Amino acid sequence: EIIASVYDKMEQTGLEHGILFIDEINCVSETLAPTMLQFLQCKTFGNQAVPAGWVIVAAGNPPEYNKSVRDFDLVTLDRVRRIDIEPNLAVWQEYARAHRLHPAVQAYLELRPQHFYRIQNDVDGPQFVTARGWEDLSAMLTACTKLDLPVDEALIGQYLRHPEVAR
């Protein structure tokens, strides 16, 4: 199915090169690990090959963010290149401007840049604020503005899951 979608995309667009993106690669079940190793090693699923000119790119979250994460064995690690990505407010602000995120979100982060990205665990469980939360909040604020609906701390707290930031 995955390989077929690549061939479908090539047929639809006429493109001969592309990126096959696989998300949450480190959440693959133990039973699928050999298949994933074959995929990374040979660029095949079963007898179906990824077309020449296509690159495989995968992403996964660290174990502290996702309880389903499995560590790769040495054989698999030897076939991938790891690039750690850190939150970067300046880069995200460029994205926010380009995608016209709600001005209140942009203004808030200009005043309180330390609130951009936070992840903490305490007795009440995880408290977090991520780039995705800011973008989702922006969409909700835009909808509330258009529909003339009130915005309060409870609503904001659904997107910014850290009490200090949601206030």
Name every feature range the model reports, one short phrase each.
Residues Q93-L160:
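Conserved AAA+ ATPase small/helical "lid" subdomain
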Residues A166-R167:
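C-terminal engagement/docking regions of AAA+ P-loop ATPases
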Residues E1-L111:
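AAA+ P-loop NTPase catalytic core and its hallmark functional loops
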